[in-house]
A protein has these predicted regions:
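Small beta-barrel nucleic-acid-binding modules, primarily SNase/OB-fold domains
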Residues: 2-132
């Protein structure tokens, strides 16, 4: 990587960081309290890396229904136990972070959500719509 490329690369924190899920926003985002240092916690929205979920502010009834289903599935997967965050970086719209999320039983959240077909794989770029 060139010096310019290295300077412009988004910083990432390898982790893992333990986090307690406080609420689920939608099918790919949740609010968590993350333990960043002993006795130090932050509340932050976490976007699950590698997935695209239907939007809660939907363009059609089918997308809204799919968004509610995806949110319910994410809440079920995350459960009550702490989760582990790794490969942590600022998301496109900073104010939330992008991370790989693993449940307490070792389930990779993105893989489980994609396997359920409630969400689509996402690697950046333009996303497909959910209404057509």
């Amino acid at each position: 990587m060139s010096v310019a490329g290295a300077a412009n690369a988004a910083p990432r924190f390898k982790g893992p960081v333990e986090a307690t899920v406080l609420s689920v926003v939608d099918g790919d985002t949740f609010l968590a309290e993350a333990a960043i240092w002993p006795g130090q916690y932050i509340r932050v929205n976490i976007r699950v890396r590698g997935i695209d979920a239907p939007e809660m502010k939907a363009r059609c009834p089918a997308e809204r229904d799919a968004a509610l289903d995806a949110r319910a599935l994410l809440a079920e997967l995350l459960g009550e136990a702490p989760v582990s965050l790794s490969n942590i970086a600022g998301a496109k719209y900073f104010g939330r972070v992008l991370a790989d999320v693993t449940t307490s039983d070792g389930t990779l959240v993105a893989d489980a959500m994609i396997g359920s077909r409630a969400v689509r794989p996402y690697r950046g770029g333009r996303r497909e719509g959910w209404c057509g």
